[in-house]
Amino acid sequence: MHPEVLDAMRPWQDKFFANPSGSHRAARIARKAVDEAREVIAAELGVQAGDVVFTGGGTESDNYAISGSVRARGGTAVCSAVEHHAVLDPVEYHAGRTVAVTADARIDLDDLRCVLDSMTSAGQEVAVVSVMAVNNEVGS
């Protein structure tokens, strides 16, 4: 971890490690810090603070991104067949489709076109397409 990040986080690990959802003094201090961080990030991104969502990790983030997109836009989702289950599971839940990959683990663009065309022909809206840029398991 970058030394500046460690220095910024040290007070929250050593002294102010309260649950920011609590009602006691330490929790209120932690909540204030979370809210201030949200404001800083929102300003950097040019969005409202309420649009910035903190999650507990990657799986929760993937689920929120896919399910939130489907719920907000309607339709379903598409992902590659080699995605992590944090992506595959919500795509499956929303009756989405998977796209094949080539022998070297790249997205099969012909299959992607075919899947999207068949969904469009069937009147299915596609809210989100999620494909990983690299895969740590197969080295692509």
Descriptions of predicted regions:
Residues M1-S140:
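Pyridoxal 5′-phosphate
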